[in-house]
Structure formats: structure tokens, C-alpha cells
């Protein structure tokens, strides 16, 4: 699986066991992702942070 880094022009290949890509936003500003990468389990959203997870190459 390949996931985009913070700047979508760059991406990385995920290590074994991390088979989801994620994108993290601040709830107050959903237009600009704060973090992107590989993850094993999609975190729950909180009052401050929203996560979007997916499982295809460069889907984040």
C-alpha cells in the first residue's frame, strides 16, 4: 500500500501491518490536512480532530 505524505506529490510505501492510509484534519479548519500517512487502525474522531481512512493506493 502506498500512502500520500503531507504534500500529496510525495508518498511512501507502508510497512507490514499498517494497511490503511489516513488524513487528519483539525475540526476548525477542514480544508487543510494536518497529517497524512500509514496507520494500522483508524483513530476515532474527537472534538478537535477528524480522521479519514482508506485502503487503496494514494487514496489519502
Curated annotation (Swiss-Prot):
Localization per record: Secreted; Target cell membrane
Summary of the tissues where the protein is detected: Expressed by the venom gland.
One of the protein's GO biological processes: killing of cells of another organism
One Pfam family it belongs to: Toxin_cobra-type
SUPFAM superfamilies: Snake toxin-like
InterPro entries: Cytotoxin_Cobra, Snake_3FTx, Snake_toxin-like_sf, Snake_toxin_con_site, Toxin_cobra-type
Gene Ontology CC terms, in alphabetical order: extracellular region; membrane; other organism cell membrane
CDD domains: TFP_snake_toxin
Cystine bridges: 3-21, 14-38, 42-53, 54-59
Superkingdom of origin organism: Eukaryota
Keywords attached to this entry: Cardiotoxin, Cytolysis, Disulfide bond, Membrane, Secreted, Target cell membrane, Target membrane, Toxin
Gene Ontology MF terms: toxin activity
Xref: Gene3D superfamilies: CD59
Task of the protein: Shows cytolytic activity on many different cells by forming pore in lipid membranes. In vivo, increases heart rate or kills the animal by cardiac arrest. In addition, it binds to heparin with high affinity, interacts with Kv channel-interacting protein 1 (KCNIP1) in a calcium-independent manner, and binds to integrin alpha-V/beta-3 (ITGAV/ITGB3) with moderate affinity. Has hemolytic activity towards human erythrocytes (EC(50)=0.074 uM) and cytolytic activity towards various cell lines.
Family: Belongs to the three-finger toxin family. Short-chain subfamily. Type IA cytotoxin sub-subfamily.
Subunit structure as annotated in this protein's UniProt entry: Monomer in solution; Homodimer and oligomer in the presence of negatively charged lipids forming a pore with a size ranging between 20 and 30 Angstroms.
Name of protein: Cytotoxin 8
Organism this protein belongs to: Naja naja (Indian cobra)
Amino acid at each position: 500500500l502506498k500512502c500520500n505524505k503531507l504534500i500529496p506529490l510525495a508518498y511512501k510505501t507502508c510497512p507490514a501491518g499498517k494497511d490503511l492510509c489516513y488524513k487528519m484534519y483539525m475540526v476548525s479548519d477542514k480544508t487543510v490536512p494536518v497529517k497524512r500517512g500509514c496507520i494500522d487502525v483508524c483513530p476515532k474522531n474527537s472534538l478537535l480532530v477528524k480522521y479519514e481512512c482508506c485502503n487503496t493506493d494514494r487514496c489519502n
